[in-house]
Amino acid sequence: MIYKIFYQETKERSPRREKTQALYLEIDAETELEGRIKARKLIEEKTAYNVEYIELLSDKHLEYEKETGVFALTEL
C-alpha cells in the first residue's frame, strides 16, 4: 500500500498550510488503519516532522500523482 503523508518540517512552530509538504511511503500492512499506524510510527522514529495527515492512495489517485510528476517514493 502506498500512503501520502502531509507534514510540516518541524514540530517547533505551529503548522501553516502554505508550508505543508508531502512524501510517499510504501507500507506493508493488512489493513488501511495498520498502514497508517506503521507510517506514523516510522515518520516519528526517523524524522522530526510534524505529521498532519496520512492518506492511502487508491489506484486512480496513484496514477494521477505519477502523471503530475511529483510522485517519488521516500525511503526512511
From Swiss-Prot:
- Which InterPro entries has this protein been placed in? RpoY
Entry's EC annotation: 2.7.7.6
- Please name the GO terms of the biological process aspect recorded for this protein, alphabetically: DNA-templated transcription
Gene Ontology CC terms: DNA-directed RNA polymerase complex
Class in the EC hierarchy, top level: transferase
Claim: Metal-binding is one of the keywords in the record: no
What family, per the record? Belongs to the RNA polymerase subunit epsilon family.
Function of this protein? A non-essential component of RNA polymerase (RNAP).
Subunit record text: RNAP is composed of a core of 2 alpha, a beta and a beta' subunit. The core is associated with a delta subunit, and at least one of epsilon or omega. When a sigma factor is associated with the core the holoenzyme is formed, which can initiate transcription.
Name-wise, this protein is DNA-directed RNA polymerase subunit epsilon
* Source species: Streptococcus uberis (strain ATCC BAA-854 / 0140J)
> What is the primary gene name for this protein?
rpoY
